[in-house]
Design a protein with these regions (language model features):
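S-adenosylmethionine
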Residues: 15-156, 160-161
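Acidic, low-complexity/disordered tracts enriched in E/D and polar residues
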Residues: 189-225
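Conserved SAM-binding loop of SAM-dependent methyltransferases across substrates and taxa
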Residues: 1-7
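Structured loops at beta-to-helix junctions and adjacent beta-edge loops in soluble globular domains
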Residues: 133, 185-187, 199
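Glycine-rich, charged/polar anion/phosphate-binding loops
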Residues: 162-171, 197, 201-202
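Core SAM-dependent methyltransferase catalytic element
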Residues: 126, 148-152, 174-190
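A general structural signal for short secondary-structure junctions and capping/turn motifs
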Residues: 121, 171-176
Length: 225
């Protein structure tokens, strides 16, 4: 709905009927009439369609392949939700279209996180700017999300959930979890350009203007080749 003022038409999707009902109520309360709501998983509601802009906040919580809470759990293992969105989004971008995606990825032994995220993107056709804004250790990550669902990590339930989660991380050599943004731009059939960076300082300014400048600079440099 935040995109309604910045676009001629908007298609908003969600897997959960209740979420769409809340969205419809908000639209009516704010006299928004250029948004179409569709129900379905991932990109299924927009199969075969392409867009000038994609904004996605998928259920990217990193954990076991199960769904405890629809708003945050994808049912995919570890960072599979972010992987799926990054693999599918380029195929739904119109020429020069852009995607702005929130996501998480695991840091595993013997694999740089940059290589992991880059491996999910196509070898041709996208300019990608990946910004990692935070990294936490497994213990902090698990306790944060347990508290998110009002479970005290010190309770019996909390201890059991913590051990299952941490054991799963250990079994997959996960030593940290990163979080941030992935911004994509369609560049036709040109070789993909992927830049992964880390924000090591507090960032409070709007990121939109910075992303706009990044893609503008990248296009200028591409034209110099």
């Amino acid at each position: 709905l935040a995109q309604a003022d910045a676009a001629t038409t908007v298609i908003a999707t969600d897997v959960h009927t209740r979420a769409l009902s809340f969205a419809e109520a908000t639209m009516r309360a704010n006299a928004v009439d250029n948004v179409e709501l569709r129900q379905g998983s991932w990109f299924e509601p927009v199969a075969g369609e392409r867009f000038d802009r994609i904004v996605a906040n998928p259920p990217f919580v990193v954990g076991l392949p199960e769904v405890g809470h629809v708003y945050r759990d994808s049912g995919l293992d570890l960072d599979g939700a972010t992987q799926r969105v990054l693999q599918d989004a380029p195929g739904h971008l119109a020429p020069s279209g852009r995607a702005f995606i929130l996501g998480s990825w695991v840091h595993v032994l013997d694999e740089p996180w940059q290589s992991r995220v880059a491996s999910w993107l196509p070898s041709r056709g996208v300019n990608a700017w990946v910004l990692q804004r935070d990294v936490v250790d497994p213990g902090m990550y698990v306790s944060t999300w347990l508290r998110d669902e009002s479970i005290d990590p010190r309770s019996d339930e909390g201890v059991n959930r913590t051990m299952q989660w941490l054991d799963h991380f250990a079994d997959n050599d996960v030593h940290a979890v990163g979080f941030g943004w992935v911004m994509l731009e369609d560049i036709g059939d040109a070789p993909s350009e992927i830049t992964c960076e880390e924000l090591t300082h507090v960032f409070t300014d709007p990121l939109g203007p910075e992303a706009e400048e990044y893609f503008t600079r990248a296009a200028w440099l591409r034209g110099k080749d």
